[in-house]
Each structure stands twice: as structure tokens, then as C-alpha cells.
């Protein structure tokens, strides 16, 4: 986690120790990652990012994981932006692009979050995961777990 300052619960503000397993939180609360933006600005530039792999993991320095080599990946991310010309005209816009997240492994944008979350959980040694979902997230997390 090169640029992570800390992880804390959004509502309570309780900080989670680096490398620690994230304990359960109160309903409606969730862990939030805070970055060292000054160091990030001085170290990372657009060119460095473009040299990464053609996937979500090109942004690894910005993700809350220890090592990109630990990535649990099925090729998520790097989905195309497609022109939606007729809708653009109907909306009075010169150009309109739509992100085609259906090209992700499970057909949903949720693969991005599942890949990062499962990667971090594996880094922490978490071997059992319970995820409550009645939709796309369940399929995505099942693929990555």
C-alpha cells in the first residue's frame, strides 16, 4: 500500500491498524482508504500509470493492496468506451460515450471491486468470505474467491 495513509471507518473514524484484519463494523459504516496525496503527486505521473498492464492493475499504486504480484485477477478492467451516437443526438450532445462493463469476466463492473477486495483479503490471510448479495456482486465475488 505505497500511498495509503490509513484505513478508517467512515462513520466512526476508528482507524484500522496497517496489516490488521478489518474487524466487523456497525451497520451503515464501512472502511475508507485515505491516501498520501502529496507523496502520490510527487511520485506518480500519467506516464508511469500508462506503462502498467492493460487492466485494472495498472492502477495498483492507487489500490489498497501490498503487492501487485498478489493480484487475484481474471482480466477485469480495461473495458472500452463506445460511442453512443444516436443517444448523443437525441440529447443534443456532440459526443457521448458509454463504458462497456459487460466485457468484464462476470459481465459487471463489480469485478473491479471484487478483484481488489479478494486480493487484499488473501494478503491478510483471510480464507473464508461471506458476501450477502442477490445479484451481480454474488456472481462476481464467487468467481474471484
Regions from the PLM with identified roles:
Residues 1-145:
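PLP-dependent amino-acid enzyme catalytic core
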Amino acid at each position: 500500500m505505497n500511498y495509503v495513509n490509513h484505513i478508517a471507518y467512515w462513520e466512526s473514524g476508528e482507524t484500522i491498524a496497517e496489516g490488521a484484519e478489518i474487524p466487523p463494523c456497525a451497520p451503515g459504516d464501512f472502511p475508507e482508504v485515505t491516501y498520501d496525496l502529496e507523496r502520490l503527486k510527487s511520485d506518480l505521473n500519467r506516464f508511469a500509470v500508462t506503462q502498467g498492464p492493460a487492466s485494472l492493475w495498472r492502477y495498483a499504486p492507487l489500490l489498497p493492496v501490498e503487492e501487485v504480484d498478489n493480484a487475484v485477477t481474471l482480466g477485469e478492467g480495461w473495458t472500452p468506451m463506445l460511442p453512443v451516437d444516436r443517444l448523443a443526438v437525441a440529447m443534443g450532445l456532440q459526443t457521448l460515450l458509454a463504458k462497456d462493463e459487460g466485457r468484464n469476466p462476470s459481465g459487471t463492473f463489480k469485478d473491479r471491486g471484487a478483484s481488489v477486495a479478494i486480493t487484499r483479503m488473501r494478503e491478510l490471510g483471510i480464507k473464508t468470505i461471506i458476501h450477502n448479495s442477490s445479484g451481480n456482486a454474488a456472481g462476481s465475488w464467487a468467481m474471484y474467491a
